[in-house]
């Protein structure tokens, strides 16, 4: 265990870190002309479909951890990959991914309200480091999303419970059977890791911890053969 992780065990350190993270997030939003801060309860939002009871409170990925996870990718060149965020909320992770030259970026969000905010943020986003300009917010239930048959990085920040997670992973597994390709799944706060690990076409690549933020990385079987 690193000394940084050990320090985060102390309540005072965690509180100071939380305050610093929130202030840094608001500064980053202001600098990039977007509004991605704030938690949202899906039960208080307009949503598509009937799975609102299976959604988890929206908490945006911190800028720091998001950039760390993207730097930690097992891909030397992302230009041939599509970035997909399932449960993309206000679009923060889409904008962080745009700092890398992905082929394109897709955000899937079932809340009409959050999708509208994400679209607004994509339009107003200003960042001289932006390397991908094809950002596509999609308003739909994740269980209905058809994964594109191309190399992809799929990001999940514990967006929904097992009722939704299972069909999503089953759809991905089926897509990999029909179109074998390199796919990486980054699952932050991997509460339902057993659901992902039950997929026959995915294997555990790494289990990581960044300042107390746990995430698992999975990769399609075809990439390791």
Question: Where do the protein language model's features map onto the residues?
Answer:
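S-adenosyl-L-methionine
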Residues: 1-79, 115-149
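Conserved class I S-adenosyl-L-methionine
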Residues: 80-89
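Glycine-rich SAM-binding Motif I of class I
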Residues: 91-95
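Conserved SAM-binding motif I beta-strand of class I
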Residues: 104-109
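Residues in the short beta-alpha loop(s) of Rossmann-like NAD(P)-binding domains
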Residues: 111, 121, 191
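Active-site segment flanking the S-adenosylmethionine/decSAM binding pocket
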Residues: 137-177
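C-terminal substrate-binding/active-site "lid" region of AdoMet-derived donor-dependent transferases
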Residues: 163-222
């Amino acid at each position: 265990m690193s000394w940084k992780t050990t320090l985060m065990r102390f309540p005072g350190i965690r509180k100071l870190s939380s305050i610093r993270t929130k202030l840094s997030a608001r500064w980053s939003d202001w600098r990039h002309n977007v509004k991605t801060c704030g938690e949202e309860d899906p039960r208080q939002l307009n949503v598509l479909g009937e799975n609102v009871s299976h959604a988890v409170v929206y908490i945006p990925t911190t800028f720091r951890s998001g950039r760390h996870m993207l730097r930690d990718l097992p891909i030397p060149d992302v230009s041939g990959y599509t970035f997909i965020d399932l449960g993309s909320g206000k679009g923060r992770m889409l904008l962080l991914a745009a700092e890398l030259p992905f082929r394109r970026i897709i955000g899937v969000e079932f809340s009409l309200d959050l999708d509208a905010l994400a679209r607004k943020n994509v339009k107003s986003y200003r960042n001289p480091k932006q390397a991908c300009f094809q950002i596509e917010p999609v308003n739909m239930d994740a269980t209905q999303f058809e994964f594109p048959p191309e190399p992809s990085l799929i990001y999940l920040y514990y967006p929904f419970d097992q009722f939704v997670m299972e069909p999503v992973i089953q759809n991905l597994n089926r897509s990999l059977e029909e179109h074998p390709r390199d796919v990486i799944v980054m699952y932050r706060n991997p509460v339902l890791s057993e659901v992902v690990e039950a997929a026959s076409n995915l294997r555990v690549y790494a289990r990581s911890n960044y300042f107390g933020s746990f995430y698992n990385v999975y990769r399609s079987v075809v990439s390791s053969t």
